[in-house]
Amino acid sequence: TDKVIVPVSFLYINAFRKALCQRLEISDMETEKDYASAESGVDGYLQDVLEHIIHNSKRPTYFFPDGSFPDTPSFKKNLYNEGLVFRYSTHPYDNVAVAKRNVEERYAFQYLMEPKFVCEEQWKGSERIQLNYMVMLAPIVKSYKEDGDTLHANQLTRYLSAAVVNTSIPQEEKQKYIHLLSTAK
């Protein structure tokens, strides 16, 4: 196909990033380790990699937003959260209904309620995977509330809150995610 969807956290994995750049027929970027020793430091690493992919691939590239995604307006048109279906499908698609069905019938969130779910140590972004649920499902909490379905709204809120609380991200960052949930009225 002519579209590529990139899970942002995977860009920290050198083998993935190299394979992606090869697939897109663009040059690879420096590694995060190289950035750590550079004057600019690692803070701009992810943003630089994303910009490199967007500008050099010369094709539609979409990013799966997750907890590590930079809050940069220039990337908004490159975000993917089932939005491509709206753009390219010839048939009507109700992504809220699909997300609700997945929450109610397919996703198994119980592990998020464990006091301390431990992700794989060898992958830097692995703990942040839990935060992907927040990006994808916070709007569904709002939809449940609008529909008067407090049972599912409260249950999903508990799961998503646990996903945030049980990470080791800084407290200030946790508060941003919790605020996202609390504003889903």
Question: Residues of each region from the PLM?
Answer:
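ER/secretory pathway lumenal C-terminal domains and tails of membrane proteins involved
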Residues: D2-K185
